[in-house]
């Protein structure tokens, strides 16, 4: 799982979900990518699940890049706890994804297999996405 090694502060404010992505909106490393169409908090488990779905489908011969990292903690209070008495303990690590962000990239010789692998990974993510290619964006 992806989590930071060290953090300066254990608890943070919730990140803003409004606005579009400022950077990372184009396929730079691979030939195909998954681009977010709506804002979402993506947990480290969802990233890992999408990565496994892609690698199991392509087996060998391709390369995958993960362009997001879950660096923000989300806190949660225990069940059946009364209001007050401070902020809850960190429960998940999330990556704040905004519309337009390319989250995963892949290079693979066969386009059909690459698109199917990305489609399977998209089903593991909590936001609407689309498959983009390097040729489409220019």
Curated annotation (Swiss-Prot):
Cite the residue spans of the region called Disordered. Answer: 1-25
Under the cellular component aspect of Gene Ontology, which terms does the record hold?
Answer: cytosolic large ribosomal subunit
Give GO BP annotations, semicolon-separated: translation
Specify whether Iron-sulfur is a keyword of the entry. Answer: no
Keyword list, A-Z: Ribonucleoprotein, Ribosomal protein, RNA-binding, rRNA-binding, tRNA-binding
User: Cross-referenced CDD domains, in alphabetical order?
Assistant: Ribosomal_L16_L10e
The record's GO molecular-function terms, alphabetically, read:
rRNA binding; structural constituent of ribosome; tRNA binding
Q: Where is the composition biased (Basic residues)?
A: 1-16
Q: Which Pfam families match?
A: Ribosomal_L16
Family statement: Belongs to the universal ribosomal protein uL16 family.
Oligomeric and partner information: Part of the 50S ribosomal subunit.
Function, as annotated: Binds 23S rRNA and is also seen to make contacts with the A and possibly P site tRNAs.
This protein is called Large ribosomal subunit protein uL16
């Amino acid at each position: 799982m992806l989590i930071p090694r060290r953090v300066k502060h254990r608890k943070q404010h919730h990140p803003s979900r409004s606005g579009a992505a400022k950077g990372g909106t184009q396929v730079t490393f691979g030939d195909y990518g998954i681009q977010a169409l709506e804002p979402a908090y993506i947990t480290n488990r969802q990233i890992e699940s999408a990565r496994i779905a892609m690698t199991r489908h392509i087996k060998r011969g391709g390369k995958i890049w993960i362009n997001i990292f879950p660096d923000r903690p989300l806190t949660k209070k225990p069940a059946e706890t009364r209001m007050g008495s401070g902020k809850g303990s960190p429960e998940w690590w999330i990556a704040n994804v905004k519309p337009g962000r390319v989250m995963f990239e892949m290079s693979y010789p066969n386009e059909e297999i690459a698109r199917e692998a990305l489609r399977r990974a998209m089903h593991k993510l909590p936001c609407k996405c689309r498959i983009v290619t390097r040729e489409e964006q220019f």
